[in-house]
C-alpha cells in the first residue's frame, strides 16, 4: 500500500525517475506509532535543493486519492503541485503553509492507511520522522574560544552551528522581523520612525501604536529621523534569476551589435494579414521577429549555438526562448522548431506559453532549454533600445526597442518622409561568436525584416 508516485502538473516524470527518485520521499515507519509513511520534500526540478511550502490542499484526516494534489511547493523555478497516485489518509502535517527553505528530503507530512486512528499522531514530531535533512553546505564560521575560566571546567559538547539555535527551532528571516502591530508599523512609516531598537510594551513584547507615539515625541526622534525601508523576502524564482544572470555576466564575454531596422513594410503586411484573418489569429510584431530570428539563424548557424565543455554545440533546430514578465519574475518559455512554423502557429504558441507563464503553470520542458532568446520591451514607448544579458548556455539574445517614426530623405515636395523603425541590439557570447559573425547574423535579420514577404516563403 502506498508506494506513492509523484506526478506534477508542471512535469510528468519518467517511470525510471519515479522508481529511482520518489522512494526517497516516502519512508515506511513503525516505532511506537501505528504503521505510517513519512512524506518528504521532493526534488521537483534538477537544480532544486530546497523548497517553500505553499497551500496545503489536504488537512489531517482527509483522504487522498490517485491524482489529488497534496500541497503546492515553490521551487527555484516555479510554483508546482505535489501529487500522489495511490490512496491513503493524511495523519499529520509537519510543515505549515508559508514555511521556507525546507531542504529536499525533509519530512513534511505523514500518510497512513484508511481506518488508522490519526489521533495517535497528535504528538508526532519532526524528530519522530527522522529529523530535517541537512541544509545545503554553507561556509563555516569560526567558533569563538571559551573564556579561560570556562575552559578550566569539564569539556562541553560541541555546540550546533549558530543558524540552528533559535529556542529549539530554525529561525527564519521572518522570525527576526520586529514584533509590531499593523497600526504601529503604519504610523512609524508615516512619521519616519525607525522601529529598530524600539521596546514593545504590548503582549509578548509587541510594539504598539502608543510605543511609536512615545518615540515620535522623544528628542532623538525629532532631531534625527532615520530613513524608512521594508525588507522584501526573496522568492525561489528571484534567487534563480539572480544566480543565472550573475553567472552569465561573469562567464560570458558579452559584445553587442546594434542596428536600426525599417519595419514600415512589415507593419503594412501585419495589418493586411490580420484584416484577412476573420478573427482566427492576430499577429504581433514579436511574431515576425521570432520568425526572422529563425531565418537568420539558419543562414548564420554559428549564432544558434552554445558553449559546452570541450566543444561548441551548434543546433539544427531553432528554439526561441521568449522573455515573459510575470508577477514572480522573468521567465523564458520556448517556442520550439520555429524554422518549421508559420506566423500563425508561432503567434498561437507565444500566446499560450505567455498565459501559462503568468498563471505559473509552465511545465519544465516548456521553459528549460532553448537555443537563442528574444527580449522585447517595445510595448514601452520610453525604451528606444537596450542591451540584454545572455541566457546561458545560449550564445545570443536579441533586445527589441519600441517603434519610432524617423524622418528620412525622400523625393517629394517636403524632401523627407517618415519611416517606422525599431532599434535592435544583439548580445553575443564572444567565446562562441566572433564579431564579424554576429554582424553577419544581424545583417540577415535586417534583410528579412525589411523585406517581410520572405517570411512567408
UniProtKB/Swiss-Prot annotation:
Keyword Transit peptide set for record: yes
Residue range covered by the transit peptide: 1-30
Active-site residue numbers: 430, 434
Catalytic activity: N(6)-[(R)-dihydrolipoyl]-L-lysyl-[protein] + acetyl-CoA = N(6)-[(R)-S(8)-acetyldihydrolipoyl]-L-lysyl-[protein] + CoA
Composition bias type Basic and acidic residues, residue spans: 139-149
Gene3D superfamilies hit by this protein: 2.40.50.100, Chloramphenicol acetyltransferase-like domain, E3-binding domain
Top-rank taxon: Eukaryota
Any one GO biological process: aerobic respiration
Protein localization: Mitochondrion matrix
Entry GO terms, CC: mitochondrial matrix; mitochondrion; pyruvate dehydrogenase complex
Gene Ontology molecular functions: dihydrolipoyllysine-residue acetyltransferase activity
Documented EC number(s): 2.3.1.12
Domain (Lipoyl-binding): residue spans on this chain: 36-112
N6-crotonyllysine PTM positions: 148
Domain called Peripheral subunit-binding (PSBD): residue spans: 179-216
Assembly description: Eukaryotic pyruvate dehydrogenase (PDH) complexes are organized as a core consisting of the oligomeric dihydrolipoamide acetyl-transferase (E2), around which are arranged multiple copies of pyruvate dehydrogenase (E1), dihydrolipoamide dehydrogenase (E3) and protein X (E3BP) bound by non-covalent bonds. Interacts with SIR5; the interaction is direct.
Function: The pyruvate dehydrogenase complex catalyzes the overall conversion of pyruvate to acetyl-CoA and CO(2). High pyruvate dehydrogenase complex activity is required for sufficient energy production during germination of conidia.
Further details from the record: The E2 component contains covalently-bound lipoyl cofactors and it participates in the generation of acetyl groups from hydroxyethyl-thiamine pyrophosphate-E1 and their transfer to coenzyme A.
Family that this chain belongs to: Belongs to the 2-oxoacid dehydrogenase family.
Protein name per UniProt: Dihydrolipoyllysine-residue acetyltransferase component of pyruvate dehydrogenase complex, mitochondrial
